[in-house]
A protein has these predicted regions:
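Helical "lid/coupling" subdomains associated with nucleotide-phosphate turnover
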Residues: 2-306
Length: 306
């Protein structure tokens, strides 16, 4: 996980979390319940463990059915969530005024200062790696990032088109301008802006309204709604439109609780995604209710049901 907040660059590596040889590490760290909570169908924990262990011993296999794909994407949500939690725990400010660090101080002060990761200040998330880059639909990549990272406020969701960022990093050491151009025009694929209010409200109440330039939408608490790039004024990808986003009284999208924000938005390949599920994201403990919600959110993103 790489991040830049307030001009401070941080990098962490969670080498034990992956989707091939180390997929069972994700299973061990998160458990079957946490993986199963992202599935739009009920699954026996024993069957889930068997499927993931088969993936571990045959790491080059790809999902053969839509159900297999949904299971793999559920595991990826947990891998991303755990890696991000690890990153937040290490990306912290130092205690006091001490700035010089040696190895010992890094471990002593790892839990000392506040985390540098402020999701409300984040402008863009770039998802890279096999599961995100090679998902059959970009909306699947966007939903995985929304579930795992829980972006707050207004955030542009993007993916690495064909998992080329590591190669561009090497290329940039010798041909910086060429690498930058490829990065901007061929690597980064914009899924669209995600609008996610922070806070909790009663289910069924209107959480957020979006208006301006031919768009008028109201989204209730617990719902996801997508304004497609081809609808209304969003006729072309990469085209910006100025919209006003107004959260309900107890919710915040960056300007304060209940305060509206007016800015330019970009639809991207998915559209403008309004995520009114609340932050932090709380899923129902009832299995049937949770499965129903997952199916509802898949449909809202324009994705097929299993």
């Amino acid at each position: 996980v790489f991040s830049v907040f307030g001009g401070t660059y941080n990098r962490t590596v969670s080498a034990n979390l992956g989707m091939s040889y180390s997929i069972c590490n994700v299973l061990k760290e998160s458990g079957t319940d946490n993986i199963g909570r992202w599935l739009p169908f009920e699954m026996d924990p024993f069957e889930m463990r068997n499927r993931l262990r088969n993936k571990m011993i045959r790491p080059t296999t790809i999902p053969q059915t839509y159900e297999d794909l949904l299971i793999e994407q559920a595991v990826s949500r947990e891998a991303l969530r755990l890696a991000f939690y690890h990153h937040k725990s290490l990306a912290r400010s130092l205690k006091g005024t001490q700035q010089q660090r040696d190895v010992g101080q890094i471990f002593e002060q790892a839990g000392g200062g506040e985390t540098l990761i402020k999701m409300m200040d984040l402008d863009m998330i770039i998802g890279s790696g096999g599961v995100l880059s090679h998902a059959p639909k970009r909306a699947q990549s966007a939903l995985m990032m929304m579930d795992a990272y829980e972006p707050e406020g207004i955030t542009m969701l993007t993916v690495d088109s064909i998992f080329m960022m590591p190669h561009l990093g090497v290329l940039s050491e010798h041909f910086f301008d060429a690498a930058r151009q490829v990065f901007e025009y061929d690597c980064i694929v914009k899924c669209g802006h995600c609008i996610a209010p922070v806070g909790q409200a009663k289910p069924g109440e209107v959480a957020i309204t979006v208006s301006g330039d031919g768009v008028s939408e109201s989204v209730k608490v617990g719902e996801i709604k997508v304004i497609p790039a081809g609808r209304g004024e969003f006729r072309e990808l990469g085209e910006f439109r100025e919209l006003t986003v107004t959260p309900s009284r107890g919710l915040d999208i960056g300007a304060g609780k209940g305060k509206a924000v007016t800015q330019k938005f970009e639809g991207g390949t998915v559209g403008i995604i309004i995520d009114a599920r609340g932050r932090p994201l709380n899923l129902s403990p009832d299995v049937k209710e949770r499965v129903g919600k997952n199916r509802e959110w898949l449909e809202a993103m324009g994705l097929p049901l299993p």
